[in-house]
From Swiss-Prot:
Gene: PSG2
GO cellular component: cell surface; extracellular region
Disulphide linkage map: C169-C217, C261-C301
Species of the source: Homo sapiens (Human)
One family name in Pfam for this protein: Ig_3
Subcellular compartments: Secreted
GO biological process, one term: heterophilic cell-cell adhesion via plasma membrane cell adhesion molecules
InterPro entries linked to this entry: CEA_cell_adhesion, Ig-like_dom, Ig-like_dom_sf, Ig-like_fold, Ig_sub, Ig_sub2, Ig_V-set
Protein name: Pregnancy-specific beta-1-glycoprotein 2
Domain Ig-like C2-type: 147-234, 239-317
Entry keywords, A to Z: Disulfide bond, Glycoprotein, Immunoglobulin domain, Repeat, Secreted, Signal
Domain Ig-like V-type residue range list: 35-144
Chain segments annotated as coiled-coil in the UniProt record: none
């Protein structure tokens, strides 16, 4: 974090003792010409880590300084101050016990929390011509590194075109913006999407296969941005009208009959077969070896989706003809 001046090991005074001192220090409010800058080390800090607000180009003849949380300079936002004469540190109402003030005006914040993000104001008081003081105010904004977001859903398994899904980008983070992507692109302009006022929540109306995702959300502040892992909705749909393969209908006695049925469905559909209105078997495939003319009739494949409750069926008329055997003609002996 760079060299620091050791914090004074002298008397610590509670903020109430600052009332008179603060009024005197703030009496003169003239602009300063010192090019004071404040730098965060490290530039991006994660929650739970430490950050140093390092002050550069501190002016000479320093009388003292005051740190405020935010840009309002009052006792409520007062964190700490340092008085050069006597090396006195004074703590205010905004002091959390995690701040350490140094004689070079730098401020160490330990175990950073979300509440620590935001602007800080450094009030520097410099000795003047012996009768007046010169003060300057320098504002710095601390940005926490955005956490990796995640997407929570009110329903990860919606029924197609029937249910509304609410996606939320977590966590809720102050002083950040939220943005959403679908299929790696910005959200299309459609009545099926609606965002909350903060963009943190996305409403999906009547989800279809075209709006099932994948979805990503991003949390961004002025210092960093982080994007979530993609989330794809498991869209429950179907079954569509089933298809029987092969569609061949004419057979001969002694042939093997093999039929397969398929319907697009999520979750996979349940299959059953009937022949001439009589249940034959369950399953997607039907196999009957060495069929006879008795196997002629109407073959129906029925499908059902247990999740959507939808059903569908299709039929195939099979005709089985008797085999015709061609015998050998007798040899005619010439006379």
């Amino acid at each position: 974090m760079g060299p620091l001046s050791a914090p004074p090991c002298t008397e610590h005074i509670k903020w109430k003792g600052l009332l008179v001192t603060a009024s005197l220090l703030n009496f003169w409010n003239l602009p300063t010409t010192a090019q004071v800058t404040i730098e965060a080390q490290p530039p991006k800090v994660s929650e739970g880590k430490d950050v140093l607000l390092l002050v550069h180009n501190l002016p000479q003849n320093l009388t003292g300084y005051i740190w405020y949380k935010g840009q309002i300079r009052d006792l409520y936002h007062y964190i700490t101050s340092y008085v050069v004469d006597g090396q006195i540190i004074i703590y205010g109402p905004a002091y959390s016990g995690r701040e350490t003030a140094y004689s070079n005006a730098s401020l160490l914040i330990q175990n950073v929390t979300r509440e620590d993000a935001g602007s800080y104001t450094l009030h520097i008081i410099k000795r003047g011509d012996g009768t007046r003081g010169v003060t300057g105010y320098f504002t710095f904004t601390l940005y926490l590194e955005t956490p990796k977001p995640s997407i929570s859903s009110s329903n990860l398994n919606p029924r197609e075109a029937m249910e509304t899904v609410i996606l939320t980008c977590d966590p809720e983070t102050p002083d950040t913006s939220y943005q959403w992507w679908m299929n790696g692109q910005s959200l299309p302009m459609t009545h099926r999407f609606q965002l909350s006022e903060t963009n943190r929540t996305l409403f999906l109306f009547g989800v279809t296969k075209y709006t099932a995702g994948p979805y990503e959300c991003e949390i961004r502040n002025s210092g960093s941005a982080s994007r979530s892992d993609p989330v794809t909705l498991n869209l429950l749909h179907g079954p569509d009208l089933p298809r029987i393969h092969p569609s061949y209908t004419n057979y001969r006695s002694g042939d093997n009959l093999y039929l397969s049925c398929f319907a697009n469905s999520n979750p996979p559909a349940q299959y059953s077969w009937t022949i001439n209105g009589k249940f034959q078997q369950s399953g997607q495939n039907l196999f009957i070896p060495q069929i006879t003319t008795k196997h002629s009739g109407l073959y129906v494949c029925s499908v059902r989706n247990s999740a959507t409750g939808e059903e569908s069926s299709t039929s195939l008329t099979v005709k089985v003809s008797a085999s015709t055997r061609i015998g050998l003609l007798p040899l005619l002996n010439p006379t």
